[in-house]
Design a protein with these regions (language model features):
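Conserved N-terminal entry element of GNAT/NAT acetyltransferase domains
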Residues: 10-31, 164, 172
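Conserved GNAT acetyl-CoA-binding A-motif
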Residues: 109-121
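Short hydrophobic/aromatic beta-strand or adjacent loop that forms the aromatic wall/cage
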Residues: 56, 160-165
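Acetyl-CoA-dependent GNAT
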Residues: 26-85, 89-90, 102
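Conserved acetyl-CoA pyrophosphate-binding loop and the N-cap/start of the following alpha-helix
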Residues: 92, 96-104
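Conserved catalytic-core motifs of GNAT/GCN5-like acyltransferases
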Residues: 117-119, 131, 136-157
């Protein structure tokens, strides 16, 4: 605290990519909806995004000045955080940007977070990605997608019904 005003330190990191370009990860503090096109890649219904966007911390990853990925993280309990949305533009997928963003989150929340959660559909694409990032199965919410979305959600040709939660113990 400085006087009676709380101080919040905002920072960005920069790292070199394999192409020798600078990768930057920065918080988004205002006008988060400017990234709606990217957010909708991970969560197809805007009304669902509205449930967590303003209460969550948002980050964008850019390389060479061009946005590649974004994520939104919410605090669910004192030491439990959840990745609510993580998306990479299709032309940049499978190039390590999502994993870099998750690794950044692990460092960013270290010391404040005991458990990091991520919820996803029962997808043959998403679950192996999160497992590769160190997450393990936690639990599932049956019929989450069919009960909460106004249209069927498909990924890799499969209709998503249950929300599958994975967790990572941050003490490991």
């Amino acid at each position: 605290m400085f006087g009676s005003m709380p101080i919040r330190i905002i920072f960005a990191i920069q790292i070199r990519s394999n192409s020798n370009e600078m990768i930057s990860i920065q918080p988004v503090l205002h006008n988060k909806k400017q990234y709606l096109d990217l957010l909708l890649l991970a969560d197809e219904q805007e009304s669902m995004i509205d449930r967590y966007l303003e209460r969550g911390e948002m980050f964008v990853l850019s390389e060479g000045g061009s946005i590649r990925a974004s994520c939104v993280v919410t605090r669910e309990a004192e030491d439990v955080f959840e990745i609510k949305n993580i998306a990479v533009y299709p032309q940049f997928q499978r190039q390590g940007y999502g994993k870099k963003l998750i690794q950044y989150l692990f460092g960013h929340y270290a010391g404040r977070c005991r458990t990091m959660l991520v919820g996803t559909g029962d997808s043959p694409l998403a679950i192996p990605f999160y497992e590769n990032c160190g997450f393990t199965y936690s639990h599932r919410i049956p019929d989450f997608f069919t009960d909460n979305y106004d249209h069927p959600i498909y990924e890799a040709g499969k209709q998503l019904k249950d929300m599958v939660y994975l967790k990572r113990n941050m003490d490991e």
